[in-house]
Design a protein with these regions (language model features):
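C-terminal ends of transmembrane helices
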Residues: 1-8, 45-50, 184-196, 316-318
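Hydrophobic transmembrane alpha-helices of multi-pass small-molecule transporters
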Residues: 99-231, 322, 330-351
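Alpha-helical transmembrane segments of multi-pass membrane proteins
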Residues: 13-25, 52-71, 103, 241-255, ...
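Transmembrane alpha-helical segments of multi-pass membrane transport proteins and ion-pumping complexes
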Residues: 12, 16, 25, 29, ...
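Membrane-embedded alpha-helical segments and adjacent helix-loop junctions characteristic
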Residues: 1-54, 209-279
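Hydrophobic alpha-helical transmembrane segments
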Residues: 14-22, 36, 59-60, 95-99, ...
Length: 351
C-alpha cells in the first residue's frame, strides 16, 4: 500500500508526506497505532535510502498522526477502548464526538507539518534530482493467499467494530473472534509453524499487567481513594463545569506526555464517574475530555505514547536517531495546537 502511494505521487517527497500522514491517521482508526507506526517508519526508511532524503520529518509526522487518528474511534487507542467499554459507548459515539475534533485537528496539523518540513524535503528532492528506482509494490507480497485472507479478516474486524452496538457484541468478544479467525487463516495459508510463532509472540506480560492494573484500580475505588481525588478536583474547580472539563483535559494531556496513558485512563474512569454524580454533570463531556487529553497529550514527548517509542526506535535503528530536542521542537507546538482546538471544541459543543 505504501509503495503504491509512493508510485502514484511519482516519488515526490512533499506529496508523499501528505499521503503518509493521511494513511497513518486513517489506519490508526482501526489498527493499533504501534503497528501503524512500525510499518510506516520501516517503509519510510526504505524510501529515504532510495530517494536520498532525511526520513525524520516524515516519521515524526506519521507518529503524530497515528496518535491523532487513534483518538477518533473507540478501537484506535487503548485509552479509548477502556473508556468505551467502561462507560458503555459505541464506535459511532466516538466518531460523533472525538472524531469531529480529530478531523479539524488533522487539517491544522497537516498544514503545520507542511510548513515545518516542506523546504527541507523539497531541497532534498532537488539535490537528488536523478531518477528513482523503488521496488515494485507487488514484490512486498510474498504470500498472496495469506495476504488476501488476512485482508478479508481485517475487513470483517472493521465491520464488526462499526456495528457492535447493533450486534451487541463487545469489543472483547470481537477481539477473540478476529484472533481465532487470524490463527485459522494463518494455519491454512502458511502452515502450523506460523501459528505457533504467532502464539509465542503474544505479549503475555502485558496481559498480566492489565489484569493487575484493573484489580488495583478497583481496590482504589473501593477504599475511597479515587473519591478523594474526585472531591479535590471538584473543590479546586469551585463546582464550575467548565473548569472541571479544562482540568481533566489538560491534566490528562500533561500526565500522558510523561506517564503511560493506559493506567492513567483506567484510574480516571471512577474519578469522572464520581464527579459527574456529585455535580450532576453529563459524564459524556468528561469522558471526551479524558479521551482527548490522554490520546493527544502523549504526542508531546518521545516517551508519551508507545507509538512514539516504536517510531523513534525504528528511526534510530535505520541510522537516523531522533533526540528529545528535535522531537519536542516540532511535536510540542503541534500538541499545543490540537489541545487548544480540543479545549475550544469542548466549550463550544458541550458547555
Amino acid at each position: 500500500l505504501c509503495l503504491t502511494l509512493a508510485k502514484l505521487v511519482r516519488y515526490r517527497t512533499v506529496p508523499l508526506l501528505i499521503c503518509f500522514m493521511a494513511l497513518s491517521a486513517f489506519l490508526a482508526m482501526f489498527i493499533d497505532s504501534i503497528t501503524v507506526v512500525l510499518f510506516l517508519a520501516t517503509v519510510t526508511l526504505e524510501l529515504a535510502q532510495t530517494m536520498k532524503f532525511d526520513p525524520v520529518p516524515m516519521i515524526l509526522s506519521e507518529i503524530f498522526c497515528a496518535n491523532l487518528g487513534g483518538a477518533a474511534t473507540m478501537c484506535g487507542d487503548p485509552p479509548n477502548i477502556i473508556i468505551g467499554t467502561s462507560l458503555g459507548y459505541s464506535f459511532f459515539d466516538f466518531i460523533e464526538n472525538t472524531g469531529a475534533v480529530v478531523a479539524i485537528c488533522f487539517v491544522l496539523i497537516l498544514i503545520y507539518f507542511m510548513l515545518c518540513f516542506r523546504k527541507e524535503l523539497e531541497h532534498a528532492e532537488k539535490a537528488n534530482g536523478g531518477p528513482v528506482t523503488c521496488p515494485a509494490p507487488a514484490t512486498a507480497i510474498t504470500n498472496k493467499k495469506a495476504f488476501l485472507a488476512s485482508a478479508a479478516v481485517f475487513l470483517l474486524a472493521v465491520i464488526l467494530l462499526v456495528t457492535h452496538a447493533q450486534t451487541e457484541l463487545t469489543v472483547a468478544c470481537i477481539g477473540v473472534i478476529v484472533a481465532i479467525l487470524t490463527l485459522i487463516v494463518l494455519g491454512l495459508t502458511s502452515g502450523k509453524k506460523s501459528v505457533i510463532e504467532v502464539i509465542k509472540g503474544v505479549d503475555y506480560k502485558t496481559l498480566l499487567f492489565f489484569t493487575g492494573l484493573f484489580v488495583s484500580v478497583a481496590g482504589l475505588e473501593k477504599t475511597g481513594v479515587l473519591n478523594v481525588i474526585a472531591n479535590f478536583i471538584t473543590k479546586v474547580s469551585g463546582g464550575s463545569a467548565a473548569v472541571i472539563v479544562v482540568i481533566i483535559l489538560w491534566v490528562s494531556a500533561v500526565t500522558s506526555a510523561f506517564v503511560d496513558n493506559i493506567p492513567f485512563a483506567a484510574t480516571m474512569i471512577p474519578v469522572i464517574r464520581a464527579i459527574a454524580a456529585a455535580e450532576g454533570m453529563d459524564i459524556g463531556v468528561l469522558a471526551w475530555a479524558l479521551s482527548l487529553g490522554t490520546d493527544l497529550g502523549g504526542n508531546a514527548t518521545p516517551i508519551g505514547a508507545s507509538a512514539n517509542v516504536v517510531g523513534t526506535s525504528a528511526s534510530a535503528k535505520g541510522g537516523y536517531p531522533i533526540g528529545w530536542g528535535r522531537y519536542c521542537k516540532y511535536c510540542v507546538p503541534a500538541t499545543l495546537i490540537v489541545m487548544a482546538v480540543s479545549t475550544a471544541y469542548l466549550f463550544l459543543r458541550y458547555l
